[in-house]
Design a protein with these regions (language model features):
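Membrane-proximal basic amphipathic "stem/tether" segments
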Residues: 1-44
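Conserved phosphate-coordination/catalytic loops
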Residues: 26, 30, 54, 253-261
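A short, charged/proline- and glycine-enriched loop
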Residues: 38-49, 72-73, 150-152, 228-232
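Glycine- and acidic
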Residues: 48, 173-175, 247-253
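Active-site and donor-binding regions of nucleotide-sugar-utilizing enzymes
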Residues: 49-215
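Conserved catalytic-core segment of nucleotide-activated headgroup transferases in glycan assembly
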Residues: 59-63, 69, 209-294
Length: 294
């Protein structure tokens, strides 16, 4: 056992975790400084890659298209494998995501080739900026986690408009290690800086990309079966948290899902008011697997 490991073994877990994160943070800051200097000297467009996981939580269409229209950028989407729900689910979600982005006209790549059982090497893509859309470690294959992005700037734009002032929502290790954290509002920026202290990232409040679509007069409403404007439209989007926090069974703060309480009621309402109201069911992507566990 090395002297460093011996010292770490004598320290509280929280202090060891902070020390390890601090070392990563320092290394990342040096990496970003080198990359910025390289880009300043390069006379070419900037290669940006969105790391996408699930088409149902993709909120970055307007951002991708703005980059695609600007000669300064070369945007690409890399569909990353979700590895915490089994191989079948991983492959299905990758197929759905890839096909959706192809239909949108994106330049899109699969990170995993099922036929050859091989993964895309991020280094081979020669990326300048990687944009993360989900902060949680263990969700995607570690090949694509921030620890293994060695020669690119990294950014984070959340997959959701956060409404909860909890540290775990704003201070995951990835959120602290990125080059720039683009958040929704000044309120969110204050929370990021509060919870990530002293290892906070460069944080900028720029709004939320999907809300750009409210300015688009040609918004897509193809998801609605009926185009009858007299029908009211209701989207029911229950959260996945039908259980308490698995790390703390006494923590009920994250049990936000009302699915078990209202599922039968919502079916009854859809039938009762089918001539007056049109419903869309849009559950959180992992609600289904949590229901199987219930």
């Amino acid at each position: 056992m090395s002297i460093v490991h011996k010292i770490e073994s004598c320290l509280p877990t929280s202090l060891v975790e902070f020390w390890r994160l601090y070392k990563k943070y320092r290394a990342k800051q040096k990496q970003y400084a080198r990359k910025i200097e390289q880009l300043r000297q390069a006379n070419r467009s900037i290669r940006v890659c969105f790391f996408a996981l699930d088409a149902s939580v993709w909120k970055y269409d307007s951002l991708y298209r703005l980059m695609a229209q600007d000669p300064m950028f070369e945007p690409t989407v890399l569909v990353c494998p979700i590895v915490n729900a089994g191989r079948k689910t991983m492959l299905h979600k990758m197929d759905v995501c890839y096909n959706d982005f192809v239909k949108r006209g994106y330049k899109v790549l699969r990170s995993y080739d099922e036929q050859t059982d091989s993964y895309v090497d991020v280094a081979s893509l020669s990326l300048d900026i990687v944009l993360y859309t989900n902060p949680y470690h263990g969700l995607i294959d570690d090949r694509y986690y921030i620890d293994n992005i060695k020669d690119a700037l990294t950014c984070f734009v959340n997959y959701t408009f956060a409404i909860i002032p909890y540290k775990w929502a704003f201070a995951q290790p990835l959120q602290q290690l990125v080059w720039t954290y683009f958040c929704e509002t000044d309120y969110h920026k204050d929370l990021v800086l509060k919870f990530t202290k002293p290892l906070h990232p460069h944080c900028v409040a720029l709004g939320y990309p999907i809300y750009d679509e409210f300015h688009d007069a040609k918004r897509d409403d193809s998801m609605w079966k009926s185009k009858d404007k007299s029908l009211k439209r209701i989207i029911w989007a229950p959260h996945h948290s039908i259980f308490a926090n698995e790390e703390n069974e006494d923590d009920v703060e994250v049990r936000w899902s009302t699915f078990l309480l209202y599922s039968e009621f919502m079916v009854q309402m859809a039938k009762k008011y089918q001539d007056k109201v049109q419903f869309i069911f849009k559950p959180h992507p992992i609600l289904r697997q949590n229901l199987y566990k219930h």
